[in-house]
């Protein structure tokens, strides 16, 4: 089979050490990946015009009630997001023209709307990281904000690489010494965490933000 870059800049097997083994440290990985990537601009496929019965591909529709949660709490997400490729592009353009120059500083403050908020759109395929990459690289000269933002794309690439090479990390620690870390199994504590009721303000704010908007600020995710 063949790999096609549908979700990343570089496929995981394209970026390796000289001996063919995967990188486990971010900095050398991204230095190699950033220099390796060459953008391939999508081309129109004239053969698609011959597909007269393309509508038949979608005759077996999936009913929304079969895939959506039983609780309708997600309805409020409509206040915060407008899912579409067009709106993802507008969000990116707004970020690049108005926010990215200060991204290096403002991204560290969860109370400030200083990030791109593009992660839901990237995750659902409404915008591709290659487009984000191109738009960022069109800005001359590059300021610290652009560099920091592109670096975050690098972390996403690195995560995809690690998961492909080490799928066991989805259910365990990549570094086995962390397996000895004490784990408290307490349903009451777990529910308090999910509801944003732990008593730790920064944790609770993040969980409530997630429940309200379906999104959590990057810095809070790290907490």
Regions found by a protein language model. Give the residues of each.
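Trp/Phe/Arg-rich N-terminal binding region typifying the photolyase-homology
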Residues: 1-46, 145, 208
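Short loop/turn and capping residues at structural boundaries
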Residues: 4-7, 132, 164, 221
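Conserved aromatic-histidine-acidic binding/catalytic patches
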Residues: 10, 14, 21, 80, ...
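Short clusters of hydrophobic/aromatic residues that line enzyme substrate/ligand-binding pockets
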Residues: 15-16, 26, 103, 183, ...
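Generic recognition of short, well-ordered alpha-helical interface segments
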Residues: 21-24, 87, 131, 201
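Glycine/tryptophan-enriched, flexible segments
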Residues: 28-177
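C-terminal substrate/ligand-recognition segments
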Residues: 160, 165, 189-223
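Alpha-helical cores of eukaryotic small-GTPase signaling modules
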Residues: 170-198
């Amino acid at each position: 089979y063949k790999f096609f870059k549908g979700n990343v800049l570089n496929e995981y097997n394209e970026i390796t050490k000289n001996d063919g083994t995967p990188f486990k440290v971010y900095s050398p990985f991204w230095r190699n990946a950033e220099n390796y990537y060459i953008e391939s601009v999508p081309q129109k496929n004239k053969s698609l015009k011959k597909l007269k019965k393309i509508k038949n591909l979608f005759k077996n529709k999936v009913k929304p009630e079969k895939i959506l949660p039983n609780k309708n709490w997600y309805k409020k997400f409509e206040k915060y997001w407008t899912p579409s490729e067009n709106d993802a592009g507008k969000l990116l353009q707004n970020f690049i023209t108005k926010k990215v120059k200060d991204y290096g500083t403002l991204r560290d403050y969860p109370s400030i709307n200083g990030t791109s908020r593009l992660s839901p759109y990237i995750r659902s395929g409404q915008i591709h990281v290659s487009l984000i990459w191109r738009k960022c690289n069109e800005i001359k000269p590059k300021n610290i904000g652009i560099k920091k933002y592109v670096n975050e794309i690098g972390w996403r690439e690195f995560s995809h690489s690690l998961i492909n090479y080490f799928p066991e990390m989805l259910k365990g620690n990549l570094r086995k010494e962390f397996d000895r870390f004490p784990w408290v199994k307490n349903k009451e504590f777990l529910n308090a965490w999910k509801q944003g009721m732990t008593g730790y303000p920064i944790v609770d704010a993040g969980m409530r933000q997630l429940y309200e908007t379906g999104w959590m600020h990057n810095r809070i995710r790290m907490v």
